[in-house]
Amino acid sequence: MRRVVCIGSVALLCLLLGLSSAMAAEAQKIVFASEIVDVIGPSSKMIGPVQSGGIIIATPEPACYGPMITPQLRSGHTQTIPVAVEGAKVGDAIALKIKKVRVLSKATASGTEIAIKDRFVGDPFVAKRCPKCGTVNPPTELKGTGAEAIRCKICGAPCITFQVTNGYTLLFDEDRSLGVTVPKAVTDEIAKQAYEYSAVPTKGLSYPVTLLSLADMPPGIIARVRAMIGNMGTTPAIDMPTSHNAGDLTCFLVGAPHKMAITKADEAKRSDAHMDIDNVREGAIVICPVKVAGGGIVVGDVHAMQGDGEISGHTTDVSAEVTLEVELIKGLKLEGPILLPNKEDLPFLAKEYTADQLQRARSIGDKFGFAVLGDLLPIQMIGSGPNLNEAVGCGVDRMAKLLGITPEAVKNWVTMTGGVEIGRLPGVVTVTMMVPVAKLQELGIAPLVKEQYLK
């Protein structure tokens, strides 16, 4: 039987007053977001608001593996507290310009894993259960290092929900330009100082994964740092774990046997902030749907690097300082985010036409008496779903609705002038295509797209 979470009238009033206070406060040019949360939605407290054109400086903790091994958290991620944007209403959009991503951690750890079957109820990321006393999301304490160091405060049993099957620890150089895998003797020393090496912020909620002393991979593997943000965007229109705010994870909440369960109809209320797209990095712009009043900008799950697909399931989570410039776009109704990546990150077919290419195309048009569509610029639509096919379908449908054309036409545009790229397995993708600038003008995003690709 599906469980329904009811919010008492007093609690609901307090939550509404909290949001109203944020929205009624004088808008600020700069807002600092340091408080950490594991669940977001309409009941979330918001800070701010920040002005359109203002700056958000967020300091998220290492937030995938850390929350996964922190039983009291109801999510596989954490994010910084939602920031309201002045004037943002449902049906608007908010552009987030990523100005700076500064890695703060000195080391990180990651790997592949399996869930331990008797230590969760339905979802090992959400409803973590102590195998001895049966408490769901039990309070815990740290005793030493390693996989059995995190123990239930009620009964003393080890209670993390995951077993790492192949893990590694990565140590960064001074300027955070690269990392190197290290041997067991070094990971043991890092584990003893895990909070310092991971640079867990003072308001962090998670245990640092570096305390597990993971060293299955050979030492000496060099990994280039190209920091990106795995979970950034707006607050969804239903309360949910921060980790599950994308179609390939929201689906696991439908009819789930725990308190964070949602209905099938609720899936569309996600905002797809948890993209894990490696091109969401310094210099990129993400245009996000507003699904609750104020928008509620959240930042988390910063990675030191990530290959397309994140096929290990996780990557190198780090503490970071993220600087965003915010721009409100009135009346742009989106179902999911639009990404404007850095010019060099665009698919080959979506790059700006050269003068020579335009001239050659116009010669063909002149010869046969038709005009060439030369005034085109690229956009990427995020699609998500339980698997890659459904994610692509989602992205295509979202693009079709945005542009007022058929999905079949989108498929042809994408095939000729863009491409589909994998953000995360099993189901987050980017759908890229060239779009007439006149249409971008009509949508109100032409200045942003021109700023990104014609500067």
Name each model feature, range by range:
Residues 1-9:
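Bacterial N-terminal signal peptides that target proteins for export
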Residues 25-71:
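N-terminal, Lys/Arg-enriched amphipathic/low-complexity engagement segments
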Residues 101-106, 111-114, 118-119, 123-141, ...:
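Glycine-rich anion/phosphate-binding loop at the beta-strand->alpha-helix junction
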Residues 19-24:
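Sec/Tat signal peptide C-region and signal peptidase I cleavage site
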Residues 31-41, 72-79, 263-271:
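Short, structured beta-strand/loop micro-motifs enriched in basic residues and often containing a Trp
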Residues 8-18:
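Bacterial N-terminal signal peptides
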